[in-house]
């Protein structure tokens, strides 16, 4: 019996706890390399947020709901709506900021392989299909030269890159921000 050390449960308990800790940290760190999420309201000045909260609900059967159509068939923000609905006011501290924002694509241009290289990112699905479109300070023009194959506009995306305050006029809608995307990916179930 001399020289025999009884086996202790301590090392196995320690190893199990260590393994569990590593697994838990590993699952939490899966997205640790990503920037924290930027909320869409961070792109809107406080004064616009207050005006939006005070605005009556839009009746989609009203004359204002018909929007303003351009010669090319695009739908623009209607001037008959409260000013906040076509506000181009921005948040200066967001300029040249690296962000990660979630939203839905409205494709504008594609490459030869059919990948979207230029699109609006909007806060809710079908935003530029429904009338009226979001305010310009709630639309982001995304430039993504690598392109992303989009199966439909109801696919939520994460877009990471440098946000710029930039007024963009387009036949479909106007935007107050543009983003040079470094990474665009589809939101996965594990993100939720």
Language-model regions, residue ranges each:
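Positively charged n-region of N-terminal signal peptides that target proteins for export
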Residues: 8, 15-18
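Sec-dependent N-terminal signal peptides
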Residues: 18-27
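OB-fold and OB-like single-stranded nucleic-acid-recognition modules
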Residues: 32-192
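Low-complexity, intrinsically disordered segments with a bias for serine/threonine
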Residues: 11-12, 31
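Acidic, Ala/Val/Gly-enriched low-complexity intrinsically disordered segments
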Residues: 4-5
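Residues at secondary-structure transition points
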Residues: 9-10, 22-23, 109, 167
């Amino acid at each position: 019996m001399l020289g025999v050390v009884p086996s202790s449960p301590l090392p196995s308990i320690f190893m199990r706890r260590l393994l569990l800790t590593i697994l838990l940290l590993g699952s939490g760190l899966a997205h640790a390399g990503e920037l924290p999420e930027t909320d869409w309201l961070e792109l809107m000045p406080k004064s616009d947020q207050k005006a939006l909260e005070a605005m009556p609900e839009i009746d989609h059967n009203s004359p204002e709901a018909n929007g303003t159509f351009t010669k090319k068939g695009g739908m623009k923000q209607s001037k008959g709506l409260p000013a906040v609905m076509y506000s181009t006011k921005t948040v200066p501290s967001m300029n040249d900021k690296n962000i990660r924002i979630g939203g839905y694509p409205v494709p504008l241009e594609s490459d030869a392989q059919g990948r979207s290289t230029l699109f609006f990112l909007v806060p809710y699905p079908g935003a530029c299909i429904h009338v009226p479109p979001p305010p310009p300070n709630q639309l982001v023009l995304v430039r993504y030269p690598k392109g992303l194959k989009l199966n439909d506009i109801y696919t939520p995306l994460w877009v990471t890159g440098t946000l710029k305050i930039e007024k963009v006029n387009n036949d479909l809608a106007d935007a107050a921000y543009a983003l040079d995307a470094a990474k665009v990916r589809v939101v996965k179930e594990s993100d939720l």
